[in-house]
Amino acid sequence: MSECGCFSATTMLRICVVLIICLHMCCASSDCTSHDDPVSQDEAEKATKLKLGSIALLLVAGGVGVSLPLIGKRIPALQPENDIFFMVKAFAAGVILCTGFVHILPDAFERLSSPCLEDTTAGKFPFAGFVAMLSAMGTLMIDTFATGYYKRQHFSNNHGSKQVNVVVDEEEHAGHVHIHTHASHGHTHGSTELIRRRIVSQVLEIGIVVHSVIIGISLGASQSIDTIKPLMAALSFHQFFEGLGLGGCISLADMKSKSTVLMATFFSVTAPLGIGIGLGMSSGLGYRKESKEAIMVEGMLNAASAGILIYMSLVDLLATDFMNPRLQSNLWLHLAAYLSLVLGAGSMSLLAIWA
């Protein structure tokens, strides 16, 4: 059984590179709106210093956010068998759900409803909702097909050994047949659940990473100090809470230390990397955020990212946990989990005022 389940770090890196190339194609495109007022040299230098500071700030915020749940695995109170664990997962799911609905999807609708696209196909069709729907359906296909593939592979690999055990036990004592078959079933169920958690964590990371690169490039390409300052603070909290949600899913995947560190690092560096790319584009590559190409690419990517996050939060995180018999049999734990969900979604919603 592959430890990574569906995607490797190399695959994620390739997706990130393709994303950067798509946005790079938006460089040197003509604006469909009037150009911004020229920025003075002094103001440009101050903006550059703020952007460099934001790289360090977002790196720390994202790193701390994604690391807390991973470190928390070593804390007894946060072990899977404890009630607090359900509350932490509900909070993380609320953060991810809000990110998709409140932060990303509205941005996609705004970009793809731009007056600049009125004379294009995008201006005559609700592409934001359409792409988000396709993205959610695609995530469902990846989720189910990948889980089914590894489940069938696991059954195939263990079928032979199971038959041998049955024959031997029948020769020795008939009562042993049921016991070994039941244990094998439990092991298979546990392995399938673990594979599913790994697939969930990696597909979820792809959706978050796409959004992180886009917001990083937007900040890096901005030349307004009045815009950069509030964005620095808001995006720091944004990365921290997104990191909490992703870190919680990675911790459940129970992967090797190397894979866990790679996934946490990959998330932490994407927003700072996006800022660096945006900084380079605004400095010498002629990036125009309001060109038709940039608007369409950003809108489509945001819509796809929103579809992934909404599906994953509702289906793979919330539905799974809130249908858990342990949660449903404990009224106070059930209410506490809902409260955590509301707090997670509410905290992330407040950031939409500034970010």
Curated annotation (Swiss-Prot):
Expressed predominantly in the roots of zinc-deficient plants. One of its GO terms (cellular component) is plasma membrane. Induction: By zinc starvation. GO terms for molecular function: zinc ion transmembrane transporter activity. It is a multi-pass membrane protein. Residues 29-51, 105-124, 220-229, 282-294 are extracellular. It holds the Pfam family Zip. The chain crosses the membrane at residues 52-72, 84-104, 125-145, 199-219, 230-250, 261-281, 295-315, 335-355. Residues 73-83, 146-198, 251-260, 316-334 are cytoplasmic. It is found in: Cell membrane. The keyword Nucleus does not apply. Keywords: Cell membrane, Ion transport, Membrane, Signal, Transmembrane, Transmembrane helix, Transport, Zinc, Zinc transport. Residues 1-28 form the signal peptide. PANTHER family: ZINC TRANSPORTER 1, ZINC/IRON TRANSPORTER. NCBIfam families: zip. Zinc uptake is inhibited by copper and cadmium ions. Mediates zinc uptake from the rhizosphere. May also transport copper and cadmium ions. Belongs to the ZIP transporter (TC 2.A.5) family. This is Zinc transporter 1. The lineage of its organism: Eukaryota, Viridiplantae, Streptophyta, Embryophyta, Tracheophyta.
